UniProtKB/Swiss-Prot annotation:
Name this protein carries in UniProt: Glutamate racemase
Organism (species): Thermus thermophilus (strain ATCC 27634 / DSM 579 / HB8)
Protein family: Belongs to the aspartate/glutamate racemases family.
PROSITE patterns to which the protein is assigned, alphabetical: ASP_GLU_RACEMASE_1, ASP_GLU_RACEMASE_2
The entry's keywords: Cell shape, Cell wall biogenesis/degradation, Isomerase, Peptidoglycan synthesis
Superkingdom of origin organism: Bacteria
EC number: 5.1.1.3
Function: Provides the (R)-glutamate required for cell wall biosynthesis.
Transmembrane segments: none
């Protein structure tokens, strides 16, 4: 029997998953979270899917050893590479971010997708929604990880990637949890296009599932503990620039995974 007071594990290649974490905390204020950022190996998007799959299994195994009651794969690349196997084989509920974002796009006639190279090439999104256009944007994650989401260079890069988007595009799936931090630049290039991310819908799915399984924490304090594979203080500085209050962060060596 899983313990309702156990934490929820959330992981991403870096800080992108903080968008999902924030949505989870809004809906589940009593839950405790372990947020794992694989900052020593970010970005995932240019790596082979088999390698990303191995990373996802390593992190999921580590989180299980910390006693989590559920795992949220808050990374589109890792969700594309590993979610079906993780969900089938792990002993706790596992949630990804691909299907929720695809569901949000179904009300639009002409939908585009931007994501990492691995996510776009995986074919994960076309399983759930018809796409009129898709584009890999490999520089977007490094821009966010370097703290440049509101720098003029972000707008230049967005123009470079998005200039060939169809003129009649109605909605664009932000197929990477880092990309919501670039909504300003993306929206400036594609005014009038609905920008869809999976954070809120993923959080709603997690909340429904935990309630159905009797796993909601009735009396938690809503704390978040941060774990990173890279420099903890660099992570803290970047996360706090993104609005995340980091009270506790610990480095996890790759040998611990």
């Amino acid at each position: 029997m899983k313990d309702p007071k156990a934490p929820i594990g959330v992981f991403d290649s870096g800080v992108g998953g903080l968008t999902v974490l924030k949505a989870l905390r809004r809906l589940l204020p009593r839950e405790e979270f372990l947020y794992f950022g694989d900052t020593a190996r970010v970005p995932y998007g240019g790596k082979p899917l088999a390698m990303v799959r191995r990373f996802a299994w390593e992190i999921a195994g580590f989180l299980l050893r910390q006693g989590v009651k559920a795992i949220v794969v808050a990374c589109n690349t890792a969700s594309s590479a590993a979610l079906p196997d993780l969900a089938e084989d792990l002993s706790v509920p596992v949630f990804g971010v691909v299907e929720p974002a695809a569901r949000a796009a179904r009300g639009f006639r002409k939908v585009g997708l931007i994501g990492t190279q691995a996510t776009v090439e995986s074919g994960a999104y076309p399983r759930y929604v018809d796409l009129a256009w898709a584009k890999a944007c490999p520089l977007f994650v490094p821009l966010v990880e370097e703290g440049l989401w509101d720098d003029p260079v972000a707008l230049l890069v967005a123009r470079h990637y998005l200039e060939d988007a169809p003129k009649d595009l109605e909605a664009l799936i932000l197929g990477c949890t880092h990309y919501p931090f670039l909504k300003g630049a993306i929206g400036a290039v594609l005014p009038g296009v609905a920008l869809l991310d999976s954070a809120e819908l993923t959080a709603q799915e997690v909340a429904r599932a935990l309630e159905a399984e009797g796993l909601l924490n009735p009396e938690g304090r809503g704390r978040t503990f941060h774990l990173v594979t890279g420099d903890p203080e660099a992570y803290r500085a970047l996360a706090e620039r993104l609005g995340e209050r980091v009270e506790a962060v610990r480095r996890v060596s790759l040998e611990e995974l």
